């Protein structure tokens, strides 16, 4: 975890500050416990997102079931609803971050929504495996105790009849 924190700190405190681009943005997750360590020292446009806090981008509502997420998001004061086949609260958080990035790049809300609806997720991260048996099968390459705990909590929250872990 320390290497992850140090890599993020380097990204925000070094690379972003030394970028020659005029429109530089730091997009930070207020739900991360160490977020204040990543706030750039020099003035850079800094935007925040959160699953629950009133920030630049946050969830107004989230309905999660085995078929995916139905989200109502507020991004820079604009509210929109979107449905995605991805599951897991971490995906809702990633969608907020991506939506904020889209806003900074002046991408239309409609285009952002259509992009989210077409997302299939990252291979190996609660990836749905299609089959003709009507069984919900997911693959996740969680290899740390915390990652495995998060995957199991997500799947248990969806109330499957039976959960088999291989």
Where are these regions (language model features)?
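Short, glycine/acidic-enriched loop or turn micro-motifs at the edges of active sites
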Residues: 32, 143-144
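Switch II (G3) loop of P-loop NTPases
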Residues: 137-143
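Acidic, Mg2+-coordinating active-site environments of NTP-dependent enzymes
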Residues: 1-137, 160-161
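Loop/helix-junction capping segments adjacent to catalytic residues or to phosphate/diphosphate-binding pockets
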Residues: 92, 145-146
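Active-site beta-alpha connecting loops in nucleotide-dependent enzymes
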Residues: 122-124, 146-166
């Amino acid at each position: 975890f320390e290497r992850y924190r140090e890599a993020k700190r380097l990204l925000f405190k070094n690379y972003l500050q030394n970028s020659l681009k005029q429109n530089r943005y730091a997009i930070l997750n207020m739900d991360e416990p160490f977020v204040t360590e990543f706030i750039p020292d020099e003035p850079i446009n800094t935007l925040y997102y959160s699953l629950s806090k009133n920030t630049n981008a946050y969830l107004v509502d989230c309905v999660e079931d085995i078929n995916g997420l139905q989200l109502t998001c507020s991004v820079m004061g604009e509210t929109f609803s979107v449905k995605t086949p991805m599951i897991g609260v971490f995906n809702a958080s990633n969608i907020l971050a991506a939506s904020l990035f889209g806003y900074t790049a002046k991408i239309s809300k409609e285009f952002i929504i259509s992009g989210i609806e077409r997302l299939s997720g990252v291979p190996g991260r609660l990836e749905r495996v299609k089959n003709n048996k009507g069984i919900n099968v997911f693959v996740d390459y969680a290899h740390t105790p915390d990652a495995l705990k998060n995957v199991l909590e997500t799947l248990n929250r969806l109330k499957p009849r039976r959960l088999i872990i291989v």
